[in-house]
């Protein structure tokens, strides 16, 4: 999955606009997310492992907020021969276009339906697996419960939700410590202080992380029988919930 180097915030801006998943971001997204999200590669690989365990024959798999298709590709490699259908959705035309290019580079018998649209408008049905990989944090907090309700209702019994998110911690010392460790991670991956500061300003109004307790309570309130965090590095985590 090719990507140009992310230098979108390398020069100073008089006014930093709110972050958008536009063509500029889509062109550098693979580099951006791997240099910004600790453990991203492991999360993507493990989503494929989970698909192998939970995808049932003749069912649907949803990648909600698919971006460039990394999770979709990981899933598709692990569910061959099960007559599954993957539905990958993103509201960015630029992401969908590049996702289509990435998917076309690999031959597979598992069909993928690409949808450019709002994940809140998609009806989930006959799903054995639903993936929300760093997507929910960009939705309005008031929309998150209804999305999870839609997912729960559309999952088959025993179906799996994978939810990856940046976390917020109410304990000030913990929040500061983990945030500092994340910033050090970004510095170690070549981001300058200017890039870090400007990107943070860009994301401030569009990304609203929840606490882990808020995630678990919201998930269990929909009826999911089991919940666990399977991965965490600093203030980034991936969770699983079983219907």
Swiss-Prot record:
InterPro entries: CmoA, Methyltransf_25, SAM-dependent_MTases_sf. The keyword Chloroplast does not apply. Homodimer. Pfam families: Methyltransf_25 (PF13649). GO terms for molecular function: carboxyl- or carbamoyltransferase activity; S-adenosyl-L-methionine binding. Disulfide bonds: none annotated. It is an enzyme of class 2 (transferase). Belongs to the class I-like SAM-binding methyltransferase superfamily. Cx-SAM synthase family. This is Carboxy-S-adenosyl-L-methionine synthase. Its EC number is 2.1.3.-. S-adenosyl-L-methionine binds at residues 40, 65-67, 90-91, 118-119, 133, 200. Keywords: S-adenosyl-L-methionine, Transferase. GO terms for biological process: tRNA wobble uridine modification. It catalyses: prephenate + S-adenosyl-L-methionine = carboxy-S-adenosyl-L-methionine + 3-phenylpyruvate + H2O. Catalyzes the conversion of S-adenosyl-L-methionine (SAM) to carboxy-S-adenosyl-L-methionine (Cx-SAM). The keyword Lipid metabolism does not apply. It comes from Shewanella pealeana (strain ATCC 700345 / ANG-SQ1).
């Amino acid at each position: 999955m090719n990507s140009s180097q992310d230098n979108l915030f390398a020069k100073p801006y008089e006014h930093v606009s709110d972050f958008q998943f536009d063509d500029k971001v889509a062109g550098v997204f693979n580099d951006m997310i791997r240099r910004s999200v600790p453990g991203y590669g492991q999360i993507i690989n493990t989503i494929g492992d989970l698909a192998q365990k939970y995808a049932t024959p003749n069912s649907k798999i949803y990648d909600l907020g698919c971006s460039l298709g990394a999770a979709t590709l990981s899933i598709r490699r692990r569910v061959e021969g099960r007559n599954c259908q993957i539905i990958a959705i993103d509201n960015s035309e630029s992401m969908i276009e590049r996702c289509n290019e990435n998917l076309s580079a690999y031959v597979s018998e598992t069909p993928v339906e690409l949808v450019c649209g709002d994940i809140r408008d998609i009806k989930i049905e006959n799903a054995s697996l639903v993936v929300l990989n760093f997507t929910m944090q960009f939705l309005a907090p008031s929309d998150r419960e209804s999305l999870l309700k839609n997912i729960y209702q559309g999952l088959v019994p025993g179906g799996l939700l994978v939810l990856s998110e940046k976390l917020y911690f109410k304990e000030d010392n913990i929040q500061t410590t983990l945030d500092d460790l994340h910033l050090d991670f970004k510095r170690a991956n070549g981001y300058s202080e200017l890039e870090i500061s400007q990107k943070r300003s860009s994301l401030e109004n569009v990304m609203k992380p929840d606490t882990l307790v808020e995630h678990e309570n919201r998930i269990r309130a929909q009826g999911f029988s089991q919940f666990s965090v399977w991965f965490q590095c600093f203030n980034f985590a991936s969770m699983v919930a079983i219907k």
